[in-house]
Swiss-Prot record:
Disulfide bonds: C89-C179, C103-C116, C108-C134, C119-C129, C353-C394
Gene responsible for this protein: Cgamma
Additional comment: Resistant to pancreatin-mediated digestion.
Keywords: Allergen, Disulfide bond, Glycoprotein, Secreted, Signal
Site location (Required for inhibitory activity against GH11 glucanase): H439
Described function: Sulfur-rich seed storage protein that remains undegraded at germination. The uncleaved form exhibits some inhibitory activity against GH11 xylanase from T.longibrachiatum, more at pH 7 than at pH 5.3, but not against GH12 xyloglucan-specific endoglucanase (XEG) from A.aculeatus. Binds to model phospholipid membranes containing dimyristoyl phosphatidylglycerol (DMPG), dioleoyl phosphatidic acid (DOPA) or mixture of dimyristoyl phosphatidylcholine and dimyristoyl phosphatidylglycerol (DMPC:DMPG), or mixture of dioleoyl phosphatidic acid and dioleoyl phosphatidylcholine (DOPC:DOPA).
Induction / repression: Secreted in high amounts upon heat treatment of mature seeds. Strongly induced by chitosan in the cotyledons of germinating seeds.
UniProt similarity note: Belongs to the peptidase A1 family.
Protein name, per record: Gamma conglutin 1
Taxonomic lineage from the root: Eukaryota, Viridiplantae, Streptophyta, Embryophyta, Tracheophyta
Organism in which the protein naturally occurs: Lupinus albus (White lupine)
Main location: secreted
Length: 452
């Protein structure tokens, strides 16, 4: 009996040994795969990063977002005051995770749309073309053209941070956006872009979806590069958190130089700050309480949104736009502080230009005085002047006419090489009192934007 049992026990021991080895090996492989895999939406990042570039032709800024399944880069215009992400889907949109929510669904309510959409472009269903879905209006922020498209949801991914380095990808599996009409990309935008990325204060803007999904502090930071060949970035999350500010090189110097002013948000979700006066070389351009410059809320001359806070921050104007009455006084005061013999014929769209050689000694800086007299945004050097032609430098401000969205609309040329913090949690905007370049820094060397 014992002899008959011996072979059986031997076989059993061998089987158990192989089973143990298999389980151990499988466990190790599983741990290895998990360690090397990209974090998904279940991971909770501290800070998210989107690299941004300047377009050489339009001087506007754009970035590549990662969307769809499998993930692919989609170039989109940066629209600070836009309500949502919109892209064109009529051609080359391929994704196994694309969905079009039904009309009157929860997603429609979240996007604040109660309009149903019926596609008439095709008899075959495709991304952007389904029936009985939600309709969502998208706008080209440069031309102001609008069109009705389909509310959609799909995967979106952004890079997290890992210490001072760019980290791995995290995903939102059901990110809401709009499949917009193709004609919206045909005018005014950089040639390569397929849509616009809205960062405004709206239910399904990129920041709000990121804050909600990942539990980030309601804050994002913008740093736009002044060169098409180098990157800037948008950071989503709290840059003042000790776990995060390691990502910003020389963060103590940069963050220490920041000042804050109250943030006002219009009914359209646009970002405004109060500019009480403009100063040129110690000469005040606009008195603090001048109703002709900044209409009061009782004035009916302008739209309500143009009367909130005085100055709107934008990324869809390459240069700062001033209401005509402000522009006239401002350029007159500026011209009085520059030798008259240096002035030359203006080059459009600018109203005041100079012979570059004759102002080589410099021009006066421009101070935007905020709600308090000691909170000042100084615009000087490359942020102030534009090389319009060979040998011709122009003041980088444009006459917007009588009826403008805001008395002042800060453009990208004045925002470049400056760290601008939109602290929505505390209703304030932070900025460097001087350009990063005055500290020998730039947006391109402030962050590590190389893929991990």
């Amino acid at each position: 009996m014992a002899k008959n049992m011996a072979p059986i026990l031997h076989i059993l021991v061998i089987s158990l040994s192989y089973s143990f080895l298999f389980v151990t090996s499988s466990s190790q492989n599983s741990q290895s795969l998990y360690h090397n895999s990209q974090p998904t939406s279940s991971s909770k990042p501290n800070l998210l990063v989107l690299p941004i570039q300047q377009d050489a032709s339009t001087k506007l800024h754009w970035g590549n977002i990662l969307k769809r399944t499998p993930l692919m880069q989609v170039p989109v215009l940066l629209d600070l005051n836009g309500k949502h992400l919109w892209v064109t889907c009529s051609q080359h949109y391929s994704s196994s995770t694309y969905q079009a929510p039904f009309c009157h669904s929860t997603q429609c309510s979240r996007a604040n749309t109660h309009q149903c959409f019926t596609c008439t472009d095709s008899t075959t269903s495709r991304p952007g073309c389904h029936n009985n879905t939600c309709g969502l209006i998208s706008s080209n922020p440069v031309t102001q053209e609008s069109g009705l498209g389909e509310l959609a949801q799909d995967v979106l991914a952004l890079h997290s941070t890992h210490g001072s380095k760019l980290g791995s990808l995290v995903k939102i599996p059901q990110f809401l956006f709009s499949c917009a009409p193709t004609f919206l990309t045909q005018k005014g935008l950089p040639n390569n872009v397929q849509g616009a990325l809205g960062l405004g204060h709206a239910p399904i803007s990129l920041p709000n979806q990121l804050f909600s999904h990942f539990g980030l502090k309601r804050q994002f930071t913008m740093c736009l590069s002044s060169y098409p060949t180098s990157n800037g970035a948008i950071l989503f999350g709290d840059i003042n958190d000790p776990n995060n500010n390691n990502y910003i090189h020389n963060s103590l110097d940069v963050l220490h130089d920041m000042v804050y002013t109250p943030l006002t948000i219009s009914k359209q979700g646009e970002y405004f700050i109060q500019v009480s006066a403009i100063r040129v070389n110690k000469h005040m351009v606009i008195p603090t309480k001048n109703p002709s410059m900044f209409p009061s809320s009782s004035s009916s001359s302008y739209h309500e949104s143009s009367e909130i806070g005085g100055a709107m921050i934008t990324t869809t104007n390459p240069y700062t736009v001033l209401r005509h009455s402000i522009f006239e006084v401002f350029t007159q005061v500026f011209a009085n502080n520059v030798p008259k013999q240096a002035q030359v014929k203006a080059v459009g769209p600018f109203g005041l230009c100079y012979d570059t050689k004759k102002i080589s000694g410099g021009v006066p800086s421009v101070d935007l005085i905020m709600d308090k007299s000691d909170v000042v945004w100084r615009i000087s050097g490359e942020n102030l002047m534009v090389q319009a032609q060979d040998g011709v430098s122009c003041l980088g401000f444009v006459d917007g006419g009588v009826h403008t969205r805001a008395g002042i609309a800060l453009g990208t040329h004045q925002l470049e090489e400056n760290l601008v913090v939109f602290d929505l949690a505390r209703s304030r905007v932070g900025f460097n009192t001087n350009s990063l370049k005055s500290h020998g820094k730039s947006c391109s060397n402030l962050f590590d934007l190389n893929n991990p």
